[in-house]
Amino acid sequence: MKIQNVNAIEILDSRGNPTVEVNLKLEDGTISRAMVPSGASTGEREATELRDGDKKRYGGKGVLKAVENVNSAIAKAIENKHFTNQRELDYFLIELDETNNKSKLGANAILGVSMAFARAKAQSSRTPLYQYLGGSNAHIMPVPCMNVINGGKHADNTIDFQEFMIAPHNAPSFRESIRMGEEVFHALKAVLKLKGLSTGVGDEGGFAPDLKSNEQAVEMILEGITKAGYKPSVDVSICLDPASSEMWENGKYKFFKSTQKLVSSDEMVKLWESWVNQYPIVLLEDGMAENDWEGWKNLTDVIGNKIEIVGDDLFCTNKSILLNGINKGVANSILIKLNQIGTVTETLETIELAYKNSYNCFVSHRSGETVDSFIADLTVGINAGHLKSGSGCRGERIEKFNQLMRIENELGKSAQFAGLKAFKNAK
């Protein structure tokens, strides 16, 4: 199938920062659109997001260069050209870029084209996007890990750790799981309000109160779960993403928003061990900094048989980095973010490697999101069993949940909700 036309424009993401939108048309008249997300806390090894750097325009965050790369170099190379499948297009774009991190054309330009082509091919063949991405066996509906309290780089408050999530797993379906999550979210709001704390929300829709400690965030959530009529651990568990790379300073971890305390790698592992023993935690993402490989190995050895340990900044959805982690026995799950690697094909290849080595895949949005629901289809396509797409509010987050409800409805009786078994080692 030939690509007849491809073009891009600059649009805005959920934080009001520019991002890339790509529109693509196939020769049979199929038209598709894709919008590229952007992260706040990014891994050092992520593919390059091309920004203009013109401080007079959007504070240097414009993406006109990336847009121009789609409209000129990429369009010239792929228009009126036949691509048999996704892999053929994506590797053509990788070769066109000529760098190992997509810094010439920009991962935001390349990914926009890659996603738009995937959506167009699915539409053209009258196949749901989740089946185009994962095949006819795509049927597992995920547990939504909802980011109900924000800290770190995602909020201007006193909490060091970036994301405190709830996982409503004791449900018969995704739709009911979302209902449980929303009820806890609203109950938590009432708890915070009663204590005179802020109910303003952060970038991902979670509350961003000023609390006395990171532990207090967990205590508040447990109170919200109970207030909503559910039992912690039995019905709803907790997932964490402290984004520890943001705390890494000269070989130590600095609690830069609360106590200003510096702790060693070993002390950080002990902290997580005590939290896992004390609270109903089923998943810990980026519990250690991306460059603290020794700490990661220690963490995996200590609690890797108790909970799911996810590498985000550590792996950056990169196949070769993941392989290094597998060989070192580090983590037992990988976070999947399309824009960390920059093409649909490379994302799927990383997922395949993870599954072959018994690692879980945890699909994720970015803090700078759009209303594109591609990751909802990806999650079902690869039968990931869990995803994080923000909190119980903000349209760009809810759109992923709405798409998942549509998919569940479409799958009918073949849809199967993952439940607690979505999480590695969960009991």
Swiss-Prot record:
Residues at which Mg(2+) binds: 241, 285, 312
Pfam family, one: Enolase_C
The protein's annotated pathway: Carbohydrate degradation; glycolysis; pyruvate from D-glyceraldehyde 3-phosphate: step 4/5
Main location: cytoplasm
Alphabetized GO MF terms: magnesium ion binding; phosphopyruvate hydratase activity
EC number: 4.2.1.11
Location within or outside the cell: Cytoplasm; Secreted; Cell surface
Cofactor(s) it depends on: Mg(2+)
Coiled-coil regions listed in the entry: none
GO biological process: glycolytic process
Catalytic activities: (2R)-2-phosphoglycerate = phosphoenolpyruvate + H2O
Cofactor note: Binds a second Mg(2+) ion via substrate during catalysis.
Binding site for (2R)-2-phosphoglycerate: 162, 337, 366-367, 388
Alphabetical list of HAMAP family matching this protein: Enolase
Name of the protein: Enolase 1
Source organism: Chlorobaculum tepidum (strain ATCC 49652 / DSM 12025 / NBRC 103806 / TLS)
Gene designation per UniProt: eno1
